[in-house]
Amino acid sequence: MKKKQNDDKLENIKQLENQFLNIIDIGCRWGFAERFINEKYHSIMKIYGFDADKLECGRLKESYKNTPEGFINCVPLALAESPGKRNLYITKEPGCSSLYPPIKYLSDNFPALKCTALEKVISIDVTNLATWAKSNDIKTLDYIKIDTQGSELEILRGAGSLLETTVCIDIEVEFNPLYEGQSLFWETDAFLRSNGFSLWRLSNLVHYSSEEKSIELNEP
């Protein structure tokens, strides 16, 4: 989702000198988008990747050890709307774990969603973007990507006024719930529009059928 009337802001970004653009990747399991890793961005960007799995953060840190110091920062934290304690629902595929319980009917009846089958529940500490940014003296969240299995909207709410510094948000949404109590597209869209953003496009549309595989709905 891209912010309305951001031409002036984009022009200002082009003119930045000696100031880093902060790329926030929440749910960074498996690594960062290649478009950001390019060495031409090493001197103008800082990437902050969040994942609740400390082992995964350690793996990512090792895999990017040859990048300049401070360019990629792996943060082993779970984000939510407010700091505190939350349950983390660990699923068969760790990348499908969520702050919300997976819907059992789906993993039982849709083969492509067996990955969301619940394995265990643990209690974890969570924080929010505003608190984390303040404690790390970060003033802007220039680009935000969120893929956190249903908790995306509350993470955005936890950014508070820092959303005013954001130019673009790449966020996973669902039209039908995969997790109990999760936010859906219409709620996320309404929240972002109320904060000055407008929808740019929907990509990677997927339909989960009762067959073995998910169905990609994107046009060529």
Residue map of PLM features:
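Phosphate/nucleotide-binding beta-alpha loop and adjacent structural elements of enzyme active sites
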Residues: 1-220
